[in-house]
């Protein structure tokens, strides 16, 4: 690096192929800023510690980095050290000498060889976020007190985490947490894997009047929560995996007449033994500003939710099977109606009892998600919904008697096989419906009525096994209604055989996809009239016999994929009728799968690929032995060429590749018969070559053993063979 000796800033972030730095990095004595974030770096050379001018060292997301250099203490001008997202096991000794540090994202407490927690004492200017990890290595409360967190007034986020091994739930660990009391200026606090049976008094002290966010995670042995209702600024509270907690009582709210005055989001998750939520009975709403309440995997929680949540907008309840169960114990009152007048979004899942369905009458409710309900046959009437998602309701038979609300804009139905799709007259009422998704549902549906929804833009039907046709309703306005449709996707409908006669009257359709429709023999007629179509994706249609032979492909197509359409082999002589060469907007073409070998050969031999192509992907053509050069040579705008899983491919046309003057990327994968790259070399424009699982090419090029062959690719800036970067 002799020419870089005056360098002050060096950024190498996001290059995951960088696994080490040269020792000569130490020669950059003027370097102030070094960013190695999200690289594959495994170790830093010791010479990094001679960069005495270094002020910023960023190592965030270096997942392979397990240690820092031993002499880090020498970087006395370092102000910002970010090691978040690394695997560092302990900090080097004497980190306390880095007194200029303003940002230290993590501090991993060492055992006998690394830094003790006392090294934090001298780092009095730390601000921002600090995570102290492996607190199980702290000797006792006296040791913890040495960290002097109380006086670190610039810290606004603090994480205190013990190791992942079995937690120590003795009095010692409570003493450690007690002495780690932070400054009152703290805004966010996270405690993870704490092993004590109770929390120290400072946690929940009303003097912490700036804390806005708190996370208590994996504190398995605590049997009660601190009085968090006293934290007047608290806006978000997340509590997870407190397996010894059985009752959440008035102590949670603390002393104030109106607890949780600022709380807006409350989440409980994976509380395996939690059975009862007892409110304080303070007289007014206990969560006056709560907007979002989330309960997940609390299988024993019985009774009712807090009944008065006047500001609640979003409620998610998952895996709480006995909550609101009217068959719960007689001592629990579940009859009180819920006052959730501002509720806009409701998500209930995994067998939550139907008592919660009373919330469907809430006037402002606009988004509803019901999943894994096993004892519901008919949906109750719903008033003003905009979005409805039904998933995995095996007993659901019908929609509400009055139909769905006319305000509905999005309807998604997944795995509701017994559900009867809406009758024609009810479908016609959904005048605002914009998106409709049907997956593995409505087994009784044989035909889908196109043109019934005047504003539908997206229709996605998958795995509807008995669907036979898409038909155009014979009503005035049906064709006009289809003018809004932009996206049509049909997948996994094995009995689909026909479309409306004369084709799809969808002038604004931009995406059209068909896959895994075994009986389908042809695409819709007059597909060339779809002048707005940009993407056409055809996959796994084994009986498809023809494509666009009555006028060619849509003229403005940009992306075209055809894979695994075996019967098209017999039609390869009419490939010219597709009019591919006339598609001046086509940028991406993907072809692959059984039977498409002949199609590709025809396209190349007749030079039918348009010159506008930017991306060409050839895959899974088992009998393809070579690429006909003349069919490639004219693709002067091609930027990326990908060839994969072509077992019989033996050589590439070198002369033709030389004509690809815009080619930047070449990917070759799983082509075992390919032994050499062209002797003529690669085009000068090529900047990236990736060879993956090609045994012949690996032997020839991986170790640069054959200089005559290596010379043909040595000009390429980046060559990657499997997962190893060669140059």
Where are these regions (language model features)?
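Predominantly recognizes leucine-rich repeat
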Residues: 1-113, 121-139, 150-170, 181-198, ...
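A substrate-engagement module of RecA-like helicase motors
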Residues: 143-148
């Amino acid at each position: 690096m002799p020419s870089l000796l005056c360098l002050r800033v060096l950024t190498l972030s996001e290059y995951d192929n960088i696994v080490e730095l040269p020792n000569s990095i130490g020669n950059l004595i003027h370097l102030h800023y070094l960013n190695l974030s999200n690289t594959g770096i495994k170790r830093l050379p010791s010479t990094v510690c001679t960069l005495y001018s270094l002020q910023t060292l960023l190592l965030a997301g270096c997942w392979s980095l397990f240690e820092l250099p031993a002499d880090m203490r020498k970087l006395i001008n370092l102000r910002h050290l970010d090691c978040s997202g690394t695997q560092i096991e302990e900090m080097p000794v004497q980190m306390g000498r880095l007194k200029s540090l303003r940002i230290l994202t993590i501090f991993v407490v060492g055992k006998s060889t690394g830094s003790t927690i006392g090294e934090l004492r001298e780092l009095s200017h730390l601000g921002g976020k600090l995570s102290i990890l492996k607190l199980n290595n702290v000797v006792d409360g006296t040791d913890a007190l040495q960290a002097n967190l109380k006086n670190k007034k610039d810290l606004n986020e603090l994480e205190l985490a013990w190791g992942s091994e079995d937690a120590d739930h003795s009095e010692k660990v409570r003493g450690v947490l007690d002495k780690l009391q932070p400054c009152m200026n703290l805004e966010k606090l996270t405690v993870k894997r704490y092993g004590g049976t109770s929390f120290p008094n400072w946690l929940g002290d009303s003097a912490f009047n700036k804390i806005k966010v708190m996370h208590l995670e994996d504190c398995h042995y605590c049997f009660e929560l601190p009085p968090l209702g006293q934290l007047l600024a608290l806006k978000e509270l997340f509590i997870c995996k407190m397996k010894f907690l059985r009752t959440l009582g008035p102590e949670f709210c603390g002393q104030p007449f109106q607890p949780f005055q600022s709380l807006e989001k409350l989440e409980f998750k994976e509380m395996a033994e939690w059975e009862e939520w007892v409110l304080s009975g303070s007289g007014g709403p206990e969560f006056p500003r709560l907007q979002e309440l989330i309960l997940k995997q609390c299988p024993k929680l019985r009774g009712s939710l807090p009944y008065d949540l006047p500001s609640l907008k979003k409620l998610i309840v998952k895996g709480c099977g006995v909550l609101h169960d009217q068959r719960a114990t007689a001592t629990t009152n579940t009859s009180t109606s819920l006052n959730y007048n501002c509720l806009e979004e409701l998500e209930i899942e995994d067998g939550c009892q139907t008592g919660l369905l009373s919330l469907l009458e809430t006037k402002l409710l606009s988004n509803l998600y019901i999943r894994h309900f096993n004892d519901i046959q008919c949906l109750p009437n719903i008033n003003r919904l905009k979005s409805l998602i039904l998933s995995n309701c095996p007993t659901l038979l019908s929609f509400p008697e009055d139909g769905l609300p006319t305000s509905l804009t999005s309807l998604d139905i997944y795995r509701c096989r017994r559900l009867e799709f809406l009758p024609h007259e009810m479908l016609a009422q959904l005048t605002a419906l914009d998106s409709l998704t049907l997956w593995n549902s409505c087994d009784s549906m044989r035909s889908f009525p196109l043109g019934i929804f005047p504003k539908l833009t997206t229709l996605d039907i998958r795995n509807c096994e008995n669907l036979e046709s898409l038909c155009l309703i014979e009503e005035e306005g049906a064709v006009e209604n289809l003018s809004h449709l932009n996206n049509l996707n049909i997948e996994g409908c094995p009995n689909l055989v026909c479309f409306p006669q004369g084709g799809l009257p969808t002038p604004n359709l931009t995406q059209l996809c068909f896959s895994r429709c075994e009986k389908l023999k042809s695409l819709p007629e007059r597909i060339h009239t779809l002048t707005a179509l940009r993407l056409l994706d055809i996959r796994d249609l084994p009986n498809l016999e023809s494509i666009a032979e009555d006028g060619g492909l849509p003229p403005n197509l940009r992306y075209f994929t055809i894979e695994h359409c075996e019967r098209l082999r017999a039609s390869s002589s009419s490939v010219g009728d597709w009019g591919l060469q006339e598609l001046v907007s086509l940028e991406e073409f993907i072809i692959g799968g059984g039977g498409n070998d002949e199609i590709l050969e025809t396209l190349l031999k007749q030079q039918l690929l348009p010159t506008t192509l930017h991306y060409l992907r050839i895959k899974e053509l088992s009998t393809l032995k070579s690429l006909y050069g003349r069919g490639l040579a004219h693709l002067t705008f091609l930027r990326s060429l990908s060839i994969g899983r072509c077992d019989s491919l033996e050589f590439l046309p070198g002369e033709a590749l030389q004509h690809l003057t815009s080619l930047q990327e070449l990917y070759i994968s799983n082509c075992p018969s390919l032994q050499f790259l062209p002797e003529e070399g690669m085009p000068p424009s090529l900047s990236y070559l990736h060879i993956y699982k090609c045994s012949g090419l690996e032997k020839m090029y991986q170790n640069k053993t054959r200089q005559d062959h290596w010379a043909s690719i040595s000009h390429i800036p980046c060559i990657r063979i499997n997962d190893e970067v060669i140059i």
